[in-house]
Amino acid sequence: PAGNRVGMTNSDGVYVDNLRIDTGDCSGPRSARSVLMHPDVDAAVFETARGGILREGLAFDRCNVAIVTNIGMGDHLGLGYISTVEDLAVVKRVIVQHVHPSGTAVLNAADPIVAEMASSCPGSITYFAEDRNHPVMATHRAQGQRAVYRDGDAIVAAQGAEETRYPL
């Protein structure tokens, strides 16, 4: 085939190669395992909900990429002894802790709780933020590391001083 056939789970369903094969909230480990075992899937993308992590753990031992966009503003509190945003961050950090050493965690530099998860990642870190000059990202880039930000009508992927623009 020309490219990878992607399996994906999220709160709307399960998809294989852009075809929905299940509907409903499929952001838990059972749906993720079904994608991992699907014979037509070459690569997988999972929305990983905190409830599933608390009830059943992760559906995988290691991942190549983990993305944490935010922790939320408390709308997911009250399940499984999760009573503060910091408690919720501990749960979401589990995904970052399971990045393969050759993998990458993509973390929101503008959210201090998310940015701090970098210390738990066995792989590399890519930070993102709206502000290209965010201090966390600026320090990271100055060390020759990767960062992503929006610049007008483009997304910019940078590593150190090198930048690649992707028009929106």
Language-model-detected regions and their locations in the chain:
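Positions that flank functional sites
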Residues: 13-14, 51, 133
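Short, basic, glycine/proline-bearing loop/turn elements
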Residues: 14-21, 41-43, 72-81
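Short beta-strand-centered segment that lines the nucleotide-binding/catalytic pocket of NTP-utilizing
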Residues: 2-17
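Hydrophobic anchor at the start of a short beta-strand
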Residues: 5-6, 43, 105, 125
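Acidic, Mg2+-coordinating active-site environments of NTP-dependent enzymes
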Residues: 55-168
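Alpha-helix C-cap/termination motif
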Residues: 2, 38-39, 98, 120
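Generic beta-strand/beta-sheet core signal
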Residues: 9, 46-47, 108, 128
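Conserved nucleotide-sensing/catalytic segment adjacent to the nucleotide-binding pocket
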Residues: 19-56
